[in-house]
Amino acid sequence: MYAKNTWEKYKDQLNEVFDYNEGYKHYISKNKTERACVKDSIKLAEEKGFKPLESFDTLKSGDKVYVTNRGKNIALFIIGKKPLTEGMRILGAHIDSPRMDLKQNPLYESEGFTLADTHYYGGIKKYQWVTIPLSLYGVVCKKDGTVVDVVIGEDENDPVVGISDLLIHLSADQLDKKAAKVIEGENLDVTLGNMPLFGEEKDAVKANVLKLLKEKYDIEEENFVSAEIEVVPSGKARDYGLDRSMVAGYGHDDRVCAYTSLTAILDSDVSEYTSCAILVDKEEIGSVGATGAHSLFFENTVAELLLKMGIDSFVQTRLTMSRSKMLSSDVSAGVDPLFVNVNDKKNAAYLGNGIVFNKYTGSRGKSGSNDASAEYVAQVRAVMDNANIHYQTAELGRVDQGGGGTIAYILGNYNMDVIDAGIAVLNMHAPMEIVSKVDVYETYQAYKAFLKDA
């Protein structure tokens, strides 16, 4: 009863759908790390009149504010007409995606090649990440405080790197292995070069790679100890399908919900309640650490907002959180016509049918789930129906088939109402994921409606 084809809704407004997705394609094509997402989000926010919190002495209704954390989180606010202590309307997405990270001592030479040791980040099917073009993104931090940005493999004139695989002719033993073991995690090593530094006798190929890095970035091998270099798929997001109805790209999980959340608040006016969009890191590995959703960053930021309103109270900070309502902006598993047996089809998400609401996620008995209350689900339904938003409800696959989690339960621990709401994705956690353009646009509209009317 909730599955409505959303293309029909926009059949006379296709230009709006496609134009919005051009902006999204540009965003994910240039922002393949959490640091890049934050940097670009600041730029977009400032163009819309948002200012850093430290530039305000006091805050009033209508003020547009942003706060960042270690270059990996950003929280944006439009101060509402009602007192902040009456709660916020929050959109929360994550901007980290599955990938591989260079180890702290990554470089070595073997059989005439220079390679870089990696440790994969998040849940991946390791065999999907070999024999494809890869890029290197990140920062190298030197002892003197200098931070060097590194991007190799994205400019059309750049070289790319990659991970090799065994030729089919010699794969008899490999093909007998289970899929989880076909490519071992310790063998996800990136090939960086094959040419020696002429005149060098020991590790000459490695020496040549280090020479090139020194020339371009002025970095030494020891600097990798204090570096964060991420290995990600190369290339831009592309239209997918002969009808151009979908977007193929890296990092839809969860940058598609990050972008729609970001643009929803940037395109919103002042509402009754304070609007908020927060983009966090580390969701793919448990939302841990100083930049994950478990961090006190968000709570501290709310306390600082209240302080600039003349309220210095731990109790009021906690009550503000408790009185808030949130959409955990995260993707859902779309039904794949080639793998329909993993879904309960009447409780599944379909590409082209609008935003997806997951009352609960988790796995095997709802373990680790937020499980939104029926009362809150009804409130969200009313907001969506009043705004003529196409939405669907889903679970993450059949019972006991697997499962997954989001940041919903973390904010729910503050006693606020939270429900997962996002976009159906195919190929989730693969180097190339797929979303429907009309779902992207409808989710943007849904997020705006939530900020305005929830």
Please identify what each model-predicted range represents.
Residues 1-454:
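N-terminal hydrophobic/helix-forming segments and targeting peptides
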